[in-house]
């Protein structure tokens, strides 16, 4: 744990070697950190010629213990920060350095590392804030409180637990959150069950067998862990239970931590309310979400399959073709929540330089973001393979855009403030953030309300797990629409593609 802005790269060193896919992610994280540090050097060089330079801390759980796996989320965020650094260097305004801070496995060391960052900020007035934060857990909540007390701005990319940054009117003045809170996600899931699930139940039994029912007869919330310190899962489950009676026609949700036949049932909706962490050593080699899918495949016969909806905690699993291609998961179509619908709707455009250049030429949104990220992706695709495995992306990960927007908020704040003042300080950042809504690549970011939650758009989308080349379809935005214009192509139950 600790922080680094050059030289030292955080990586795993598992005794006896790692799974090839894990080793591949290690290589990706190592490459990303090295690229960030090279861009830091370039920022220093142009700052010597008079450009304003600001620093941000990227704070996440970058390493994992030997018994745990981690996925591409942290790499995606580092790559989003790289895009922000490069776009800034190509312009004429402020440039940005990124200090990488590691909170350890699952952010368990968030508090001591936060104290290190606070000490660093006391010595470095050009350090304007912290982005990332990785997990809605008790240690991260404590770290946010420490940053707030030290007047260090924080922009959390994916945190969503209710009250993670305090509760109104006592919410933390220096805390800002891009993702909607869990109460919003719970409402979207429940409205999806009320409005959209019946459309699937009305389809032929070849599409989904509901035993002749057109509404959910049972809602089961599967919560892999009841750890009260995991604020993401605990508040989401509480929200689902509390809000369900407000949705006419829905049965009262039941909560279980047990895997088995109780998950089965035609016209049963299983809500996966968890992450996709790997359990303690010796229990299973599968992550929690994969084990959930495997049990349903093994224990539920074809006329007894539940309708599956997963929270946004599985979005990184979905985005990893290798994870979806594991044996034993069956061929289920599942619905899941994404807070990256704006990027999902770009498809593969931002992954390939020719497509990104065409987007830039036509003046479409995301132009500079797309072209810069596409060049980074080509370097990632060229990384050495590990036992035949190479990196493969089908669309731009939502965390790439979230991290880019988080950094760009600080860059724009510096730019706007400098137009009529000297260089900005940390104390002025909140005032800049709340002054006006701001258009990011992930959507409209509006911190003008008292809660400092941008509430970027959530959507429920659908995907077939069995195919490593499948992409999400049938966007349900839950804003008075049945299905939105994207992403992808696929038959939706109202007949739209």
Where are each of the predicted segments found?
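Extracellular/periplasmic periplasmic-binding protein-like sensory domains
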Residues: 183, 298-404
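Signal peptide-proximal N-terminal region
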Residues: 46-48, 78-98
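Glycine- and acidic-residue-enriched helix-capping/strand-helix junction motifs
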Residues: 67-79, 227-235
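Beta-alpha junction/loop-to-helix N-cap segments that form part of ligand/metal-binding clefts
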Residues: 72-76, 91-167, 452
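Extended repeat-based interaction scaffolds and adjacent low-complexity, acidic/S/T/P-biased segments
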Residues: 1-58, 93-96, 108, 126, ...
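An alpha-beta-alpha
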Residues: 171-257, 292, 353-362
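Segments of small-molecule ligand-sensing domains
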Residues: 380-478, 486, 491
């Amino acid at each position: 744990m600790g922080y680094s802005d050059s030289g030292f790269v955080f990586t795993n060193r598992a005794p006896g070697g790692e799974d090839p896919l894990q080793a591949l992610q290690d290589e990706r994280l190592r490459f990303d950190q090295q690229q960030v540090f090279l861009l830091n050097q370039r920022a220093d060089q142009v700052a010597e010629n008079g450009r304003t330079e600001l620093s941000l801390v990227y704070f996440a759980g970058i390493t994992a213990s030997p018994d745990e796996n981690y996925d591409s989320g942290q790499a995606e965020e580092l790559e989003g920060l790289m895009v922000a650094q490069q776009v800034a260097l190509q312009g004429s305004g402020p440039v940005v350095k990124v200090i990488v801070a590691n909170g350890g496995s699952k952010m368990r060391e968030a508090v001591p590392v936060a104290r290190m960052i606070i000490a660093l900020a006391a010595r470095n007035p050009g350090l304007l804030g912290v982005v990332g934060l990785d997990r809605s857990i008790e240690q991260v909540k404590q770290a946010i409180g420490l940053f707030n007390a030290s007047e260090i701005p924080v922009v959390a990319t994916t945190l969503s637990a209710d009250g993670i940054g305090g509760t109104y009117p006592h919410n933390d003045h220096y805390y800002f959150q891009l993702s909607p809170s869990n109460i919003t996600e719970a409402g979207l899931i429940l409205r999806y069950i009320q409005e959209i699930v019946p459309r699937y139940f009305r389809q032929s039994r070849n599409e989904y067998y509901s035993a002749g029912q057109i509404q959910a007869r049972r809602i089961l919330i599967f919560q892999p862990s009841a750890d009260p310190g995991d604020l993401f899962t605990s508040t989401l489950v509480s929200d689902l239970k509390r809000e369900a009676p407000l949705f006419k026609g829905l049965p009262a949700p039941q909560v279980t931590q047990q895997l088995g036949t109780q998950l089965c049932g035609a016209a049963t909706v299983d809500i996966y309310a968890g992450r996709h962490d790997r359990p303690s050593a010796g229990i299973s080699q599968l992550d929690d979400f994969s084990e959930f899918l495997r049990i349903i495949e093994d224990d539920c016969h074809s006329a007894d399959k539940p309708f599956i909806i997963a929270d946004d905690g599985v979005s990184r699993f979905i985005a990893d073709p290798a994870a979806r291609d594991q044996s034993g998961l069956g061929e289920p179509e599942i619905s899941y929540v994404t807070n990256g619908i704006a990027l999902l709707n770009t498809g593969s455009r931002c992954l390939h330089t020719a497509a990104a250049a065409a987007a830039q030429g036509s003046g479409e949104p995301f132009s500079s973001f797309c072209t810069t990220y596409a060049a980074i992706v080509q370097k990632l695709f060229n990384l050495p393979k590990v036992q035949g495995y190479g990196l493969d992306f089908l669309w731009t990960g939502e965390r790439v855009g979230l991290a880019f927007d988080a950094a760009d908020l600080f860059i724009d704040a510096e730019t706007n403030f400098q137009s009529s003042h000297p260089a900005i300080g940390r104390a002025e950042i909140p005032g800049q953030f709340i002054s006006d809504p701001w258009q990011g690549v992930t959507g409209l970011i509006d911190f003008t309300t008292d809660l400092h939650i941008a509430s970027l758009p959530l959507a429920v989308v659908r995907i077939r797990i069995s195919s490593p080349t499948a992409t999400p379809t049938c966007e349900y935005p839950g804003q008075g629409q049945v299905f939105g214009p994207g992403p992808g192509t696929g038959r939706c139950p109202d007949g739209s593609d």
